[in-house]
Amino acid sequence: VYHGPGARSWEEVPRPELREATDAIVRVDAVTICGTDLHILKGDVPTVEPGRILGHEAVGTVETVGAAVSGVRPGDRVLVSCISACGRCRYCRTGVYGQCLGGGGWILGHRVDGTQAEYVRVPFADTSTHLLPPEVTDETALMLADILPTSYEVGVLNGQVSPGDTVVVVGAGPIGLAAIMTAQLFSPGHIVAVDLADSRLQAAKQFGADTVVSTQDSPESVVAELTGGLGADVVIEAVGVPETFELCARLVRPGGRLANIGVHGKPVTLHLEDLWIRNITITTGLVDTCSTPTLLAMLAKGQLDAGRFLTHRFGMDEMEAAYDVFARPQETGALKVALLREAAVSDGGAR
């Protein structure tokens, strides 16, 4: 439960109940923590009110459904998407679910109580959950709730990664690593990962980056050398601070694309005095999760190794410990953590 910037607690709350005919109540069997949750705790998302249960990623079992729900039934095992969609408004009809006008969008853990609980009320259950095939585990399915569709849609697709491209990913946290993983679906010529932490750079190498470079080692010079002075075709910002966005703008070539994924809590200077003449396309976006069915099919066929993101497991009642580990990745090596209803963890959560 969020209690204002810097304040959180794991506490007893009433079990959620159906409010609308389109709702489902889902027993949470596996849940994770997102970098956005850390942004909320910093106060970067002022629309989140104190008292809100956080979390927007979960896998669980349907307990009850409203009278209008026809796509899932009690007992079904489902992925709870980070984006809720009414399915009827102008945006939903064009697949832009993140901008839903009918009461959806990013609401879980934001405007309504979220998934970091034993049970969660899922609005618009027919369009906001996905049935899971038996060959996909709870832990791997968790990666489809947010980080994989976010990196794929907002980073790779918005950046229009194409065969032969030089792609730079600034920020090698879970979202950046997911961008590295999904960028490879389009056969880029070279992937460069930029980060401050050596542990994250090593992880980027394991996830498929061809070159890794510290932010302290002149990424501009490295990219210039790799591209014959042109700059990168695509630069993906996966941090969310002014300095990294401005670095991305310096790394992209004239005519290139800068795709911002990072959640920004402070104003960023857009240097149009330099950019106006360079024909650069800059995209931003909230994930729509329109790619989730495609990614789920790939995961079921073994074409995406989503389990690589999971570094720590906890029991559901170890939420405070999980947050502490996830918030200190340079010390703990955490990428993604999973909190499991049936977990029997006695080693501090490490896999």
Model-derived segments and their meaning:
Residues 195, 262, 286:
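Conserved acidic E/D residue at the C-terminus of a beta-strand in Rossmann-like folds
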